[in-house]
Amino acid sequence: MTMLKEIKKADLSAAFYPSGELAWLKLKDIMLNQVIQNPLENRLSQIYVRAHVGDKIEIYPLLSRDAEVGFNENGVEYRGVVGPFRYSVQMHFHTRGWFYDVTVDGDLEFDLVYLQDLGLAEQAAVRTNEAYMSQYIDYHVTEGATGFTVQARQNQPQNERFPAVQIGALTKIVGYATDGFDIYGTNYKLTSELANLKEKSLPSRVYQYEFAQISLQTELFTNHGETIFYGYATENQPKASGAPFENLAELKSNISEQPYQPSTKAILNKHIGTPITGETISDSWLQENFPDRIQEEQQNGALLSFFTPNYAHVVMREKEAELERPHGSILLDKVDVLNPEATLSATTYMYGAFLSQLVAGNTNMNKWNSHARNPLNILQTSGLRIYIELDSELRLLGVPSVWETSTNYSTWYYQWNGDLITVQTTLTADSKEAFVTVHSEKGHSYKLVLTNQVTMGTNEYDTTVKKEIKDGIVTYFPAEDSPILETYPALQFRVDGTYNELTDERYFAKDYVGTAGLDVFVFEPSDKATFHVQAKLSDEFSKPTEDLEANNKVIRASYDELTAQFHLNHQSTTAEKLNLTVYWYAHQMLVHYASPHGLEQYSGAAWGTRDVSQGPFEFFLATGNKAVLRKLVLTIFSHQYQDTGDWPQWFMFDKYTSIQQEESHGDVIVWPLKIIGDYLEMSGDAGILEEAIPFVDRESKTFTKEQGTLLEHIELAVKTIEARFMKGTALSNYGDGDWDDTLQPANAQLKKNMVSSWTVALTYQTFKRLAAFLPVGEKYETLAKNVQADFAKYMTNDTDVIPGFLYLEEGKAPVWMIHPEDKETNIKYRLIPLTRSVISELVDKKQASRNFEIIGEHLLHPDGVRLMSEPAHYAGGVSTHFKRAEQAANFGREVGLQYVHAHIRYIEALAKIGDKSAWHMLDVINPINIKEVVPNAALRQSNTYFSSSDAAFLDRYQAQNEFGRVKEGSIPVKGGWRIYSSGPGIYLHQLISSVLGIRQTEDALIFDPILPEELDGLECHIELDNYPLDLTFESADEGSIVVNGEKQPVENGANLYRTGALILPKKNLTTKCSQITIKFQKNNRL
């Protein structure tokens, strides 16, 4: 970034553009504001004067490019006239914060509103995920002589510090807000108006959500008004917020008055108008263009969304207006599932982000352009944007009338000004290309201006962008200061198209050159335009794709192959809904596997050791892809640390090998061992155990030259597990945590002495599997029995409630944590030990029945099961027992307790005991027309996996006090973060392998359906091990199998809780394509 004016007062620093726009605000390395801004963006930190005229309110920003700006060593001044007001604002800095001295004159009633966005964490943390950091900022509001004061504390430690800021005023504050959604409103995407600033009063409520922004409202002034807003920052506030700091007036009086030196005022070459929003589309247009609509979603008689026969998802603008989480899509090219590290991916958003975060391979590093940092489209330079220029006014294309997306393309339809403008972004199958095309249906000529914020790395502004322009073609290279250069030196992106001119920010204003990282492509007026970018990771660019329509068919067909040609038929619409789900969740499994990132969680790029061992592995297990499973096993084991036998929590699976998180939770070491048993049972590939693969050197984070057989890797890991058993037991130490990341121990004493009952159950299951399939099975059988014996001794000997944790301090009596007798946490029940102990067959029938009684009574809610019977106690964000569970100020994601991954494991446990409600439980977490199943479900995007179902409590205190409303279904539940999760893969695994019960071993097909009787006659097509199978499920008094009209002799598999699965030897299938009727037992439940 260039041209910044930095003001520094000891540890506090702020950077401005000469025209007065704030770039960033820091206390040491703590970024106080949320986004590093450029002068072309709407400013998040702002002061508005609001004219109250009758019933209407007119709002005017004071800190704008129209102001006359001056600087001195203490701050910046803004002066000017806006609407009916004359104003001056002086921003003064001191060593701990800032003051805004505001004076406004105007012949009417008005008030002032100050907006301050917050990052309140180390810069790298804030820029990794603004929404995540917002979830951990606690707001504390006090009311005193000057009205309301808002304190904000970062509850997640930043290098052992808890930064805080106090925002207030020296005059009366009568209203406030704590989250940007309470100011802008979801409709901002369509109107560009801050909806709640048009209301007489701010909401004056603490809303702990994902857009950290404090807003303050003054009392009304008549004709003349003065106020002083302030921000007072603290580097470390270990305790929860309490009484506010009072000596602000004294601090203010110590700032010396100095004249301001006038600064350069940026002169815009073009007027930037309000964005274009598509008009409401007509029913006749929809009927003509989308006559066949599947799973229509309606509200109050209006159509909101639907799917096409080809499974594309189509959304109306009216739905987008209501969502906090904007409609988005992660587009993929045709993924090479054996070599996923070169996948081309891009993110699109309905609100007019046509191509953002375009990556070739690594989603953090090999990134061509920037990603969206705000869900409301307030920041409009991210990624690739398109303006229409009319009479020297530039208008951005925003929310369309209709948006359509598939797995490799998105299309925006703008009904506007008597025309239909179509924008389409398409990724090609194999040639690493992205096309953006614009077309006018009426043949109208438009002058288009396309902006692209180039990063050639993780973040905008971080690295130099190196490019070469020749004959209108722009080629982008890794620069000398880029980490790409030594890892993927051949990486390039090449751009061409029908543009006439390539320029930069000077197209908007010459003073903005170098401020935003924009390339600006100007097109001559035409009724169509094309923009094309191609990536390469090796020496040569691929041959370009010519036929995009044929390309789309190739990619669509690849999903049929990926899902083993899976298809359901039934007279009800449930089959149709699940066919759609299989298609979209297969795509989202591929995102998790091949291009790890999400819509909200835009950073990623790595495989979590436990995550890849679940979502992708279980998907490929369910669909029978032995080659990918084998490669996955060897890849995961090659990342094992040679000295400890453990794994990193996560690692990059491409050439950025050294980037990984060394410390891992106590269960992580178990997952690679678990997949060994699963793979060997399915494949019979005992030869894999003799494959020689490297380790990772924990110091250098590189592969070792020395190799060990897979079996040696396995044995090393098992030795490590044994070494970590609590003294005198076969119970694994909790270490840094288990699957529930929010329950990491808060101190070293807990870490040392805790045992997770869930990890113990998983370990037992894994040892049992190894005993069945490894050469020295007796050893693992003995280990399993020892684990089972100690589980019974310590966990269930004197109670019928499995505790969430055991506290086992040497020399003291064992203590149950998360248990009805636990008076420390006051949490009674924990879900995942109850489900995993059944899945693993660790507990007997009586205990299994008790587990499900507990779940039904205490953990099951209308939108699914919750992780605990009560939330962890929250007291301002200070940890006592657990880290994030007691730190998160937002009641969402795992902290909100309905984490969908765990609900899917509940489905697995239901299938284990033969409970036919498993099918309904699949429906409860399906986003397609979810309100038909969960009446209190809030609207959400219908084609994306949501990782949690979040009860719409404003903050943790309301959640604690009113948690019973979740069970009642009397509070709305919102969809959480989307797409990036192991959830889509395990959902499809449970659908196919547990609920439909279709599994295989090396020499047999296994059928174990757990279906309600209303699905009698359900048909399923699937291809396993080169056998195309046409299956029909029929309920019966006894289970049996009929193949091509002939009843088969079958055996039952083992199941501790009920009659086991039907086993059909593959040798009995005499024809390649078989018609198989599975008669499933009506009453086969524990």
Curated annotation (Swiss-Prot):
pH dependence, record text: Optimum pH is 7.5-8.0.
Listed EC numbers: 2.4.1.333
Record-level GO BP terms: carbohydrate metabolic process
Active-site residues, record numbering mapped to chain: 741
Catalytic activity: [(1->2)-beta-D-glucosyl](n) + phosphate = [(1->2)-beta-D-glucosyl](n-1) + alpha-D-glucose 1-phosphate
Residue ranges the record marks as coiled coil: none
Lipid metabolism listed as a keyword: no
Temperature effects on activity: Optimum temperature is 37-45 degrees Celsius.
Keyword Glycosyltransferase among UniProt keywords: yes
Family matches, as Pfam families: Glyco_hydro_36 (PF17167), SOGP_2nd (PF21250), SOGP_4th (PF21270), SOGP_N (PF21958)
One GO molecular-function entry: glycosyltransferase activity
Enzyme class: transferase
Disulfide pattern: none
Keywords: Glycosyltransferase, Transferase
UniProt cross-references to PANTHER family, sorted A to Z: CELLOBIONIC ACID PHOSPHORYLASE, CELLOBIONIC ACID PHOSPHORYLASE-RELATED
Main function: Catalyzes the reversible phosphorolysis of beta-(1->2)-D-glucans. The minimum length of the substrate for the phosphorolytic reaction is 3 D-glucose units.
Protein family membership: Belongs to the glycosyl hydrolase 94 family.
Assembly description: Monomer.
UniProt-recorded name of the protein: 1,2-beta-oligoglucan phosphorylase
Source species taxonomy: Bacteria, Bacillati, Bacillota, Bacilli, Bacillales
